[in-house]
C-alpha cells in the first residue's frame, strides 16, 4: 500500500497538469509495486472493476497467454487535464526485479520522441518512481543515470520520484546503504535533489512544480525524495512488528 507516502498522487497530478500546459503530449511512467494500484486508479483512471478483477483472476481472450500479478501489469490511457488538454499516459509493465523498468522507460520515451514527435524531447516526459532501498541498492539505476546526456540514449531529462518509507522490506535504511541519502546516485551527474516531507502535501506539490520547471528548461534529470514512512507491512503477508518492533510500536 501507499499509506505513508500518499503525497505521490498529488505530486504526479501536479506534474501532469502543469506539463500539459507546457506542451507535453505524452508521459511514460515506470514504477514498481508500492502505490501502483493507487496510481493506476487515481492518475491513470483505470476502472476499479478492472483492478479488483485482477485480485480474483480473470480469463484472457488469448488462450496461450497467461496472466500476471496485478502489480506488474501496465496501462495506457488518454487523460484530459483541468485546462482541457488531452495527453497520453503510459505505465510500463514491470517484473518483480526492482528498477529494471528504468531503462525500459527511457527506451519507450526515446522511441516516441524519435518516431512520433520528430525528436522533440519536450513532447514526451519520462517519470520514474523508485523505492528508497532499491534506488540505492540496484546498479541499474546508476547505469540509467549515466545515460542522461549520451547522444544515443538521452531523453531530455527524467523526473525521478523516490517514495522513501525508510525501510526496504525488513531492512532498516542504516543497514541498506553507505551514503547519507538514498538519492546520492544523482550526485554523479550533479542533478538537483529535492528532499521533502511526504506529509506536507503543499511542499510536495511545490517540489514537483520546481522539478518540472527544471526539466523543461535545462533538459536534465532531477530527483524528488519524498521522505515518509510505511504504515503497514511490505505486502499483504508481512507483519512488520516481527522485524521492526520498535518502529511499529
List each model region and its residues.
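Functional cores that coordinate and move charged inorganic groups
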Residues: 194, 202, 208-212, 216-217, ...
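Acidic, Ser/Thr-rich peripheral helices and adjacent loops at domain boundaries
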Residues: 175-183, 187, 244-249
Amino acid at each position: 500500500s501507499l499509506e505513508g507516502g500518499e503525497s505521490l498522487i498529488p505530486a504526479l497530478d501536479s506534474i501532469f497538469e502543469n506539463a500539459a500546459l507546457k506542451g507535453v503530449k505524452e508521459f511514460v511512467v515506470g514504477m514498481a509495486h508500492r502505490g501502483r494500484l493507487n496510481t493506476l486508479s487515481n492518475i491513470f483512471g483505470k476502472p476499479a472493476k478492472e483492478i479488483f478483477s485482477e485480485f480474483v483472476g480473470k480469463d484472457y481472450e488469448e488462450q496461450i497467454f497467461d496472466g500476471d500479478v496485478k502489480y506488474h501489469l501496465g496501462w495506457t490511457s488518454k487523460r484530459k487535464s483541468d485546462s482541457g488538454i488531452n495527453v497520453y499516459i503510459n505505465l510500463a509493465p514491470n517484473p518483480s526485479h526492482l528498477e529494471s523498468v528504468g531503462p525500459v522507460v527511457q527506451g519507450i520515451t526515446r522511441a516516441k520522441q524519435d518516431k512520433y514527435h520528430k525528436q522533440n524531447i519536450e513532447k514526451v516526459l519520462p517519470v520514474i518512481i523508485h523505492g528508497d532501498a532499491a534506488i540505492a541498492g540496484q546498479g541499474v539505476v546508476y547505469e540509467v543515470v549515466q545515460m542522461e546526456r549520451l547522444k544515443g540514449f538521452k531523453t531530455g531529462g527524467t523526473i525521478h520520484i523516490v517514495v522513501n518509507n525508510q525501510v526496504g522490506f525488513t531492512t532498516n535504511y542504516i543497514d541498506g546503504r553507505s551514503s547519507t541519502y538514498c538519492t546520492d546516485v544523482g550526485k554523479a551527474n550533479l542533478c538537483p535533489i529535492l528532499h521533502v516531507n511526504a506529509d506536507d502535501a503543499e511542499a510536495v506539490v511545490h517540489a514537483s512544480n520546481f522539478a518540472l520547471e527544471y526539466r523543461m528548461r535545462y533538459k536534465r534529470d532531477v530527483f524528488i525524495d519524498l521522505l515518509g514512512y510505511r504504515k503497514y507491512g511490505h505486502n499483504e503477508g508481512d507483519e512488520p512488528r516481527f522485524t521492526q518492533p520498535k518502529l511499529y510500536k
